Amino acid sequence: MYAVFQSGGKQHRVSEGQTIRLEKLDIATGEAVEFDQVLMIANGEEINIGAPLVVGGVVKAEVVAHGRGEKIKIVKFRRRKHYRKQQGHRQWFTDVKITGISA
């Protein structure tokens, strides 16, 4: 059984027991969270596709950890003009473990 749900402007395909990395959620570590924007639920040969959301579809998860991703560097450069700017960015994330999928 798997489901596709939307969180943080992205769509994620998950199954029970899977741990995924999402955009930062303002929920404490160890707490439960429910995602109700479920786009699709598949259970064997039975596939339930929403229009746009599955009615009554819920993905339940538990927050495992919060953190920051790898640093990316942004460079702005003009040749021969002695001009260079460099900037870094680390995006916040939340790791969640999927505990249940229901339709």
Swiss-Prot record:
GO molecular function, one term: rRNA binding
GO cellular component, one term: ribosome
Classification via Pfam families: Ribosomal_L21p
One of the GO biological process terms: translation
Keywords annotated in UniProt: Ribonucleoprotein, Ribosomal protein, RNA-binding, rRNA-binding
Domain of life from the UniProt record: Bacteria
Function text: This protein binds to 23S rRNA in the presence of protein L20.
Subunit structure: Part of the 50S ribosomal subunit. Contacts protein L20.
Family: Belongs to the bacterial ribosomal protein bL21 family.
Name assigned to this protein: Large ribosomal subunit protein bL21
Record gene name: rplU
